[in-house]
Amino acid sequence: LWRYGWEKERVRPIGWYDEHGPRATMQVSPDGDYTQTGIRWNSQGYTSPTHKQYIEAPARSGLYYLHAKGESGAFFSFPWIVAPKEPSAAVAVLAANINWNAYNNFGGRSNYIHADGFVPTPTVNARYELKRYTDKRHLLFSEPDYPPLSFDRPEPLNFIPENDRITDPIEGRSACHVAPAEWRTVGWLEREGYAYDLYAETQLDSGVLDLDQYKVLIISAHPEYWSAKMYYRLKEWVFERGGKLMYLGGNGLNCEVEFLDEYTMKVKNGDQGGGFSHLQKIGKESRFDLCHESEAKLLGVTCSETGIMTGAPYRALKADHWVFAGTGLKDGDIFGENCLHMRCPGGASGHETDKMTVSSPAGCELLAKGLNPDDGGAEIVYHCTDSGGEVFAVGSISYPSALPVDDAISRITANVLNRFLG
């Protein structure tokens, strides 16, 4: 068991998992669509109490990883979100476990592959069989309803190599927008000396996380999928009770999910395509807007397709704002060139980017904009509420991957957090 902060800290060994019977601990894929029901690996064959092994959560909240290594030397790692028994800091951070589940295709389905259910015959060659790759007119979300997705599945997309350090480039397709990227956020907090409590997003929905026990909430990287309960709890906290929100990511709060039980969710994608350009045609800005309202009413920004899958630095537009104090930046200066995000290299504005819309709150200030193609740069915005609440949003999935290595990004983020902490 390891704790992932600014450094990887070995907590303790867990021991060997083995049994007398030949291949008794070999896992098998159950029959049926376990993307809906869960893989239930522990439901068979652990009848005796002596067969069971438990791990007690560490007392200190944080992002933990379990390291597993077989006799062959093959290595695998997976995250464990450890929330506090009681609030212990002024800052709460959410790990985006709902988003992890939406993108997890273990078992053959995710919210992006066979989102509307399995086809009658298994896919053999995705590029030749899935409309995602064969039909340029294909709309990602075109059905009125979508089968559930279970949290009870392994998450290979959150794997972090054994020898990776927090300042190493984030390689691969998935790692740069899920737990490995979020590690850069909590690691940066520790490097800068900020205490924090880490929670799973689902704990905001369940009520385990009480926002009123904290001054600041941080969400980062790619918190795309939220329940309506989560959204309105956060909005009420910011607009009515003076809560401070730091949105250090992109394409956030973009689509509603519903929890059927503790382990299962349904995504409310709608049947209008899902993209900003599709939804604009019917006067909507996001899938969340289809069911409720635009997330820009809270965040100040919402995601659009321009700039997608590119990376670029930001340009300062209002350098005399307190956000830029101590950076030495002037209007027109470029910052955020250094970034660990290797899927869309080029800078802290990237991967998927958010911009202001007509739904942004009155008084929302545009402080900087990314230099991505097609005017697709992420927009850094700030707004405050009558209750004393404040929101700082960076509009970019790539942003947290710049925190450990870009001085200006680090200083700007610290300026905001220091002000929000008072």
Language-model segment annotations:
Residues 4, 13-16, 33, 44-49, ...:
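Intrinsic-disorder/low-complexity accessory segments
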Residues 16-19, 24-46, 51-60, 174-260, ...:
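Helical hinge/lid and interdomain linker segments adjacent to catalytic or ligand-binding clefts
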Residues 54-58, 80-85, 384:
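Extracellular and analogous surface-interaction loops
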Residues 56, 284-386:
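Catalytic beta-strand/loop cores that center a nucleophilic Ser/Cys/Thr
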Residues 192, 206-230, 235, 248, ...:
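Catalytic-domain carbohydrate-binding cleft regions of carbohydrate-active enzymes
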Residues 2-40, 72-211:
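Aromatic-Pro/Gly-enriched surface loop or interdomain linker
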Residues 224, 228-329:
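A glycine-rich, often tryptophan-bearing local segment used as a flexible ligand/cofactor-contacting loop or short
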Residues 62-69:
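Short, aromatic- and glycine-rich surface loops/edge beta-strands on solvent-exposed regions
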